[in-house]
Amino acid sequence: MLPLPSELQIQAQSIKQRFSELPAPPDLRDEDIAVLALSDFVSDMLLIHPQWLEELHQQPPQPQEWQYYSQWLSQALAGVQDEAALLTALRLFRRRVMVRIAWSQVLQTSGTAETLQQLSTLAESMIIAARDWLYQVCCRELGTPCNRQGVPQPLLILGMGKLGGGELNFSSDIDLIFAYPENGQTQGGRRELDNAQFFTRLGQRLIKALDQHTIDGFVYRVDMRLRPFGDSGPLVLSFAALEDYYQEQGRDWERYAMVKARLMGGADDPYSQELRQMLRPFVFRRYIDFSVIQSLRNMKGMIAREVRRRGLKDNIKLGAGGIREIEFITQVFQLIRGGREPRLQERALLPTLQAVAELGLLPEQQVADLSGSYLFLRRLENLLQAIADEQTQTLPNDPLNQARLAWGMGYADWAAMSTALENHMQAVRVVFDDLIGDETPDIGEDPSHGLYKSLWQDVLEESDLAPLTPHLEEAARRQLLATISGFRHDVDKRTIGPRGREVLDQLMPRLFAEVCPRPDANVALSRLILLLLSIVTRTTYLELLVEYHAALKHVIRLCSASPMVASQLARYPLLLDELLDPQSLYQPLAPSAYRDELRQYLLRVPEDDEEQQLEALRQFKQAQQLRIAAGDITEALPVMKVSDHLTYLAEAIIDAVIQQAWNQMVARYGQPSHLQQSEGRGFAVIGYGKLGGWELGYSSDLDLVFLLDCPLDVMTDGDRSIDGRQFYLRLAQRIMHLFSTRTSSGILYEVDARLRPSGEAGMLVSTIEAFADYQRNEAWTWEHQALVRARIVYGSPKLHQQFDAIRQQILCRHREDPQLQQEVREMREKMRNHLGSKQRDIFDIKADAGGITDIEFIAQYLVLRYAASEPRLTRWSDNVRIFESMAHYDIMSPEEAAALTRAYVTMRDEIHHLALQEQSSKVAADSFIAEREQVAASWHKWLAANDANVS
């Protein structure tokens, strides 16, 4: 055993003092002091439970003692009579055994592979013991779940990730998926429940038993987000539902996750065999699957983006050459060849790497290097986490913890340990880069760049610039020169370091070579400089633009076309990662894919880290808006599709925000008890305005109204129980908070809830009955106009049907036409007086006469006027399809409907493009004359009055 360095000797003295103050001070041996000095977790536990130290002396930890964990746990649970006692027993058992594992790990009486086995078996034993105990309790309370033949049904649990691979780290989440074989009902209970309800309740109680923080801590953080549909999906699925999902909707990333999936408990009963056989074809293809290469390239890029996004430094898991890359290398062979090579279907990494060597897929020396690096990194990770039982993979920067890790890894000091670590990670990186065969970065020097070096490195006169920009006017050339000079001056005032300066000197001539030949070179460069100033001290992004010429060209193209995009990139440089794949950049996601893509994005963020979750939501929105804007700028997306994509994106984010708020509220208060007998969450969100009408723009806010379905006497079922309706009020407040909180990536959306019943004076959340009553008896005509553009964007099928029925009933009421005309007209005049342009030489596309708002009012008036006789007019909430319906049902001529639609789309298109230019909706007074004349004619026809025509 190495002598303790000075930092640990000081720590040892402090520990001796603390143990000497115990009622019966133990006799500490040298090895005891070494472990206690290395791990605050172990020393804290043994101070609370000094008898565990005596046990360590009497029964020292053995490498193979994991075989007895289940037996020991059964003894610990033998006297447990209720759930509170179960939670206490599980937590104490976990702490006791984790102390033993940390002890043998530090003293190296167990190897790293054995430590991983111990940690994984401990988790599995506790999951299964808790499941079995709770299953019996649930059967007594609710009856036994049976299939249609009366055969009892079990809960099967898939351990994912490192748990599934038997490679759990010291302080880790556990990723689980719950399943049961067949649908049916409970038997022997007071009333029948279907199996889905039974297993959902069992699953919820199991998660609580493992995950809930008590005075004794917790057992494991449980992450259920890998299940089908993630947080928005059922907690437990039948085999049939699982099979349908993976056959019809399983994504590549879910296939990768399934490689390590393992049934907890090691059972080999028919149900377990059936589930394994069902999943195998999804994971391992029968043919050699080279189609996976591109997906793996995308994953490689995702790793790099993740490191940049989270600002990860010194991270031994996600950093270059880290644990994740070794796992990735191993999965490449499993996914490509695993269907035909059973030896590659191992879940554990080291045996799979050995099979890779035996099959000749990698040189033996590389496999040996990878295996050695993996064991080195996993031991380092476990020692790091054992310091305080914290889930971290970031190396410390304080001398004490650096000394702990260096000593624990067998090195004299931190410098020696760091050198060994660097060598291991470099060896991994070499294999990782070779294996995926990513496109070679374009780092060659274009000969033409030499012409532009002097433009960056020398102080030039205007006459010197003329040969490089012969097409520019003198004024534009002067502006270009001033921009370069100003940027050079700004850079000189910043600390960018020698590497940053070197990369910037490579980048600027390349950038000038692309920008200077452009006819708008002066404008383009002024926009690009804003971005460069934001990243000039962040060498990673400068390197990205140097190494990937295509990315540089995309930046120039987009920033030149849109100052909005330029300012977004300048504020949030992590969006530069989106430029690496031009195919996805100019092709936004399929409308149905936003929810799934966001779900994957959020999976990379700890579920309980609200700050990171908020950041991730905002970063996802910005990245997707950039892709939509790119499609808009290049005319790959017409105006209607731009709004469709912005609306689908908003709906996906609404869904995720509600999920996050719901999880937080349920963790605090439990869920309203009436939900145990009903589908859904008793909560709905109505989208009004541009969201409701599928007409969102780049900077649109969200008009939302919250509805609930909850009886009066309901309470939540958590330890801190509150009134059910109070729960929904706080849920809505939480949702508003998550949208509006300003992080380093800004806010998510501005949310306006003033269209709710009684406006700002009304309750933030209304019951569905109160909403219906208000619409019937108190709402103004303008509120019914707003209802034309309203639709449900979140809620159960029941609430969906209820809202649609209320909306149709209200819109189909008989209305006296003269009065309706007058009320619609008066509201429009009031808006125009308040919002319209007061300047004769300006036309406001939105607010002035003949503009978009007039078109919207015509559509709303026609629905309110004619829906009583033709209820099908209420089907759509967007203006274009409303006009189509008016023509279809012979209320408006096809020619007029088409003309209004053309005017509407043309003006909407201009507003989108003005937004990309960061300009308002005000244009010259002689704009859109033909469109405005058509709108004025239709306004006069339908809402006849002495309304001012378009001049």
UniProtKB/Swiss-Prot annotation:
GO BP term, pick one: regulation of glutamine family amino acid metabolic process
Signal peptide region: none
Organism in which the protein naturally occurs: Yersinia pestis
Keywords annotated in UniProt: ATP-binding, Magnesium, Multifunctional enzyme, Nucleotide-binding, Nucleotidyltransferase, Transferase
Enzymatic reactions: [glutamine synthetase]-O(4)-(5'-adenylyl)-L-tyrosine + phosphate = [glutamine synthetase]-L-tyrosine + ADP; [glutamine synthetase]-L-tyrosine + ATP = [glutamine synthetase]-O(4)-(5'-adenylyl)-L-tyrosine + diphosphate
Chain segments carrying region Adenylyl removase: 1-440
Nucleotidyltransferase found in the keyword field: yes
Source lineage: Bacteria, Pseudomonadati, Pseudomonadota, Gammaproteobacteria, Enterobacterales
GO molecular function, one term: magnesium ion binding
Similarity annotation: Belongs to the GlnE family.
InterPro entries: GlnE, GlnE_rpt_dom, NT_sf, PII_UdlTrfase/GS_AdlTrfase
UniProt name for this protein: Bifunctional glutamine synthetase adenylyltransferase/adenylyl-removing enzyme
Cofactor field: Mg(2+)
Region (Adenylyl transferase): 449-951
Source organism, top-level taxon: Bacteria
Coiled-coil annotated residue ranges, if any: none
Database matches in CDD domains: NT_GlnE_GlnD_like
EC number(s) stated in the UniProt entry for this protein: 2.7.7.89, 2.7.7.42
